[in-house]
Amino acid sequence: MQPENLFGPITQIGYLTDDIETTAAFWTQTSGIGPWTRMSGVSMATTMDGEPSTINIDVAITYKDDIQIELINPLCDSPSPYLANKRAGLWGLHHMQFTTKDINASMELAKSAGLELACTIKQGGGVYTYLRGHGVWFEMIQASEELEMFFGMIKSACDDWDGKELIRDIAL
């Protein structure tokens, strides 16, 4: 009997890096994916382990088929889901993201599965939560029309990519 899939399909795989340009080029050379949409200096108000925090990151996003690949470069030492990895120099796989229509119901399922809420972020019309898992973070994102349009724009750029302009910078 196959185990139950509590959260639906994985919608994103997140990686930490200290060099988005080099990491994006590597992914493109080895996987043929691109272009990358980069947002620099993104500041987010968060709650990490019950305490308010502000984190600053550079982030770049692309798609491989229907899976979003996210590169995150943490720019600060504020409490965040990224801090321990950054301090230890642990770059690479960081989290799996699941998109949900009901984040509260998904959070209850996560807790019943033994995952622990660590961080909540409200940014760009969305609510994101990070949960501690066994060696990898689980991220839940509340689906919204605004986010679907934004991610749809990035996916369309990937579907139509001609191999030029590896990184496209946008402001949030």
Residue ranges of model-derived segments:
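Glyoxalase I/VOC metalloenzyme domain signal
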Residues: 1-11, 15-37, 51-58, 63-116, ...
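Conserved catalytic-core motifs of GNAT/GCN5-like acyltransferases
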Residues: 37-41, 121-122
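Short acidic/glycine-enriched loop/turn segments that link adjacent beta-strands
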Residues: 123-127
